[in-house]
């Protein structure tokens, strides 16, 4: 203290430091829409192109209602010129009064546009191939023809008071100058958004980011992105597109679509809740993902993949002893996703030779038995020994524990643990099976 007995000033800040989400958007990405994105669900358009898919009218309506309840912003439907029933289904879904806007996906052709605007849709998604592959082997038109057709269709759809998106097809194998010229042309006449499509799944995140940033410099409208998953980059590409400034992402339930599909709805939600938790939790009913995936899986006769983000049957299961110990102390040690956000539970898989004594101790507590730590370590060794010989199940482990306990002179029971609301880890291991369908 100074001689004049004055108080010294406090130089350090007394306010709590502001912490940023380390898994969120990079602050340098000033165009990022990671916290302001929209979803266009294409299960009833792209998903219909999945090899196993056949959705009758009733099933389409059921899926559309489920997606609307989940909170998607748009629902995209098969072109009404694809078949007579496709047109009728489009009209039927438009009459449901859903909160989500209804889109249909058409070729860049006036014949398609005239039919589309009569169905009652809120918007029309127009697409035409721009790569040399598609111009030569698909529609056979040059860029001048594409630009002229695009302007004609866009102006017609706009005259009907309907949203319009123009997208190139096979964007990442198209000439960049051609792409930017066509996008500038359609932006000038007032499209609601332009679309980038990785039609063959060839793009990587760095290419996506660079193209989106370049496109943002030449158009003022929103950017929509459609990523196929042929090389396994669909989720990463979608996230990177949002970082670069795209706003809308095409998804489908379980990623179903042409070949091995597109960005999956559930998988993207897993990525986005880590990056923008408040936005995602407030906008989407995440606990509905499991039901929607089961609905679509049943409709197309597939199982939920075991390694599916969120709903794979092992998504929140912990097996190794080191992992189990840490999870029992603090789930964040080995989980970036909270299963409760999705209406799921976490499990400790203790019936195996990799188990640790902390997991067995938790099981002993559940069985209301009284063992010391040293005794638990001893019984754990017995469990691991049998686990070296054959696969174990919960009954095997419980029998070993109970037999061990019966041989001791300690009290048979300890006071019953009534539990608390914080008991959120199930170590029963009962859900682990070879069945890949997630059930409640």
UniProtKB/Swiss-Prot annotation:
Protein's name in the database: Homocitrate synthase, mitochondrial
PROSITE patterns: AIPM_HOMOCIT_SYNTH_1 (PS00815), AIPM_HOMOCIT_SYNTH_2 (PS00816), PYR_CT (PS50991)
Primary localization: mitochondrion
Residue numbers bearing the Phosphothreonine modification: 410
HAMAP family assigned: Homocitr_synth_fung_arch
GO annotation terms (biological process): lysine biosynthetic process via aminoadipic acid
Necessary cofactors: Mg(2+); Mn(2+)
Membership in a protein family: Belongs to the alpha-IPM synthase/homocitrate synthase family. Homocitrate synthase LYS20/LYS21 subfamily.
Source organism (scientific name): Saccharomyces cerevisiae (strain ATCC 204508 / S288c) (Baker's yeast)
Active site per database record: 323 (proton acceptor)
Biased composition (Polar residues): 1-23
